[in-house]
C-alpha cells in the first residue's frame, strides 16, 4: 500500500496495476493507499483524501485526465479531469477533447 522504489518483478507490476485500477483514496495520516473506498467524494471519511488532492510539486503545470472512479462522475479542478461517467452501469461514455477543452458524453 506504499510505493517502494526497490520493488521488482511481480510485486512491482502488482503495485502499478493496483494504482492504475484501484487507487481512489489515501490515508490522510500516512498517505498509504486505501483500496476499499469507492463512493462519491461527499461520502469520503475525514481520514481519507482523494489521491489527486495531495499536493505534488512535480505535477505543477500538468493536467491529469483519469477515469475508473465512476462514483465521482465528471470532476474538474485546475489539475485533474475525472471522466468516468459509468458507461458499464448504464451511464454515459465520456471523453476529453484536448483541442477544445471540452468534455463530450454520449449515452450508453
Residue ranges, per PLM feature:
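Feature recognizes metal-dependent phosphohydrolase scaffolds
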Residues: 1-108
Amino acid at each position: 500500500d506504499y510505493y517502494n522504489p526497490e520493488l521488482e518483478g511481480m510485486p512491482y507490476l502488482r503495485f502499478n496495476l493496483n494504482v492504475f485500477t484501484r487507487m481512489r483514496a489515501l490515508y490522510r495520516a500516512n498517505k498509504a493507499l486505501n483500496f476499499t473506498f469507492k463512493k462519491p467524494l461527499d461520502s469520503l471519511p475525514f481520514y481519507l483524501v482523494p489521491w489527486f488532492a495531495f499536493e505534488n510539486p512535480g505535477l505543477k503545470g500538468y493536467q491529469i485526465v483519469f477515469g475508473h472512479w465512476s462514483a465521482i462522475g465528471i470532476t474538474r479542478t485546475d489539475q485533474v479531469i475525472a471522466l468516468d461517467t459509468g458507461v458499464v452501469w448504464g451511464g454515459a461514455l465520456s471523453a476529453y477533447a484536448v483541442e477544445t477543452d471540452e468534455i463530450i458524453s454520449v449515452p450508453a
